[in-house]
Amino acid sequence: MSVVPPNRSQTGWPRGVTQFGNKYIQQTKPLTLERTINLYPLTNYTFGTKEPLYEKDSSVAARFQRMREEFDKIGMRRTVEGVLIVHEHRLPHVLLLQLGTTFFKLPGGELNPGEDEVEGLKRLMTEILGRQDGVLQDWVIDDCIGNWWRPNFEPPQYPYIPAHITKPKEHKKLFLVQLQEKALFAVPKNYKLVAAPLFELYDNAPGYGPIISSLPQLLSRFNFIYN
């Protein structure tokens, strides 16, 4: 059973104002109802190769052991990943790095202690996909689209901090990276760069993991323009 506040109008709350007692405070910050992002065809982009880029850790166990050791020294690990989108036949596709036959990841990695998130992601994007001819890549990063936390030194990650966790072991941020109309990417030889359509990712945690399979929902707030 709901109770209607005595000051509430029968036609709904006043729009654009906030009520505190009998006073109204005008909201000055505009609400962004629609964020427009330009997408370009996959065929606009050129993909070359460069020397292999290997993981810091030789196994999952080694990764969590290093995370444990670093946590004791510098605290929670901060990770950033970039979401790059193209389109084919007006269907959005996310660029993923494929290692082997079944492992997919977003480009990104660990931040250095004290490193700015956006500048760190630009550094990592250049290390992973940056071209080799000396031309600097212009990474446009304006939108954080997701936050994930690792509560323990174990694989599970969640888009929230569980109530009983006071010291998460890793915080991962996902950023939308807006691509220029044309670009050249250099892909490490031990990876493939694949374009996965959103309908393939949607609700497909068994194939891509919980983070990548959540991208269709995270990206649904954007209005894509297919150029």
From Swiss-Prot:
The record marks 55, 63 as: Interaction with RNA. The modification N6-acetyllysine is found at residues 23, 29, 56. Residues 76-201 form the Nudix hydrolase domain. Keywords: Acetylation, Cytoplasm, Differentiation, Methylation, mRNA processing, Nucleus, Phosphoprotein, RNA-binding. Changing residue 103 to A: Reduces affinity for UGUA RNA by 99%. It comes from the Eukaryota. This is Cleavage and polyadenylation specificity factor subunit 5.
